[in-house]
């Protein structure tokens, strides 16, 4: 699949990029039953298609988030409920967009190179 991944043309908007990727992701994951394998591939596709600094997931384990598959620099392994952007999004049950992490109270700097987050 990686060799045949079709990406949007240079300058395409986010919506168009997602529309092109969605059927490919469905095809990529339709015959695979392993959650980790599918999550890992979806993350790799998103990183390649959008060039994000970091793409990954955390899994809820008791009262903390535990790092799952990701692409990018080293990440925090565990994040407590209600802490940082990820823990706050989990606690509040909502998506959080942070344009400037320095402006987010309690931001956890897993990487000093990260300047924004979408959780």
Predicted regions and their residues:
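A short, aliphatic-rich beta-strand micro-motif
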Residues: 115-119
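A generic fold-level signal
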Residues: 52, 112-114
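Intrinsically disordered, low-complexity terminal regulatory regions
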Residues: 1-68
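Regulatory sensory and allosteric helical modules in signal-transduction proteins
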Residues: 60, 64-112
């Amino acid at each position: 699949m990686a060799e045949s991944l079709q990406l949007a043309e240079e300058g395409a908007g986010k919506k168009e990029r997602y529309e092109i990727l969605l059927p490919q992701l469905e095809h990529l994951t339709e015959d695979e039953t392993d959650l980790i394998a599918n999550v890992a591939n979806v993350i790799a596709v998103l990183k390649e298609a959008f060039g994000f600094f970091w793409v990954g997931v955390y899994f809820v384990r008791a009262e903390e988030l535990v790092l799952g598959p990701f692409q990018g620099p080293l990440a925090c392994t565990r994040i407590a409920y209600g802490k940082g952007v990820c823990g706050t999004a989990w606690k509040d049950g909502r998506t959080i967009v942070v344009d400037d992490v320095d402006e987010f109270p309690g931001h956890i700097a897993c990487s000093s190179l990260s300047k924004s987050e979408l959780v």
